[in-house]
Regions:
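Soluble metallo-hydrolase cores and metallopeptidase-like ectodomains found primarily
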Residues: 1-33, 52, 56
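Solvent-exposed loop/turn segments at secondary-structure junctions
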Residues: 2-5, 15-19, 70-74, 114-119, ...
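Zn-dependent metallopeptidase/amidohydrolase metal-coordination segment
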Residues: 154-168
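Acidic/histidine-rich catalytic neighborhood of metal-dependent amide-processing enzymes
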Residues: 31-134, 163
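Structural element of the ATP-grasp superfamily
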Residues: 47, 139, 166-167
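Surface-exposed patches in mature extracellular/periplasmic domains of secreted proteins
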Residues: 58-64, 150-157
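Acidic, glycine-rich loop-and-strand cores that form catalytic or ligand-binding grooves
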Residues: 131-151
Length: 168
């Protein structure tokens, strides 16, 4: 949105889902794919809705909506080799090295992942809170002001390897 505007934010989500259910309690499902309605599709759905609203609201800043792939690839739990962080977030790793515009720099970015779970609760993710605490505070305060405070809990959560890990 507004590609010529210098003042930009980036919104991210991944559209893939885990190719196998290796953490499922039922071992028979360990080599079947995950459906991905929450982990994959929910963030994409929210960003598509944001894009629809951008046509009406016309914010002053530029907004880049980025869909990445292979966030959930990783290695299967049965794999006997090393389980490395860089096996995850393949699309975001690629995008971080090859942004859509040379020298791209957003003021901040927001990753939407697993936002469609029943009774979802969002806490400050550790890396995000370390790198951009002011952005976290703004998002959580805005959510609270809009009546969504029960979902955006103002407490620290843990560290999560996700697309933001590689983009930060």
């Amino acid at each position: 949105y507004k590609p010529d505007t210098k003042k930009r934010i980036a919104l991210f989500s991944h559209w893939d889902s885990r190719p196998w259910a290796d953490a499922d309690p039922d071992a028979k499902k360990h080599y079947t794919p995950i459906l991905g309605a929450n982990d994959g599709a929910s963030g994409v759905g929210v960003l598509l809705e944001i894009a629809r609203h951008l046509q009406k609201q016309l914010p002053e800043m530029g907004i880049d909506i980025v869909f990445v792939d292979a966030e959930d690839y990783g290695t299967h739990q049965a794999y006997n080799g090393p389980h490395k962080e860089e096996y995850w977030g393949l699309g975001s790793q690629y995008w971080a090295r090859n942004p859509h515009v040379q020298g791209y720099n957003a003021r901040f970015g927001i990753l939407l992942d697993m936002v469609g779970g029943k009774n979802a609760e969002f806490r400050y993710e550790s890396l995000s809170h370390e790198v951009a605490p002011n952005v976290n505070e703004k998002v959580w305060k805005t959510a609270n002001a809009l009546g969504f405070g029960r979902y955006f809990v103002q407490k620290k959560g843990g560290f999560v390897t996700d697309d933001h890990t590689f983009i930060n």
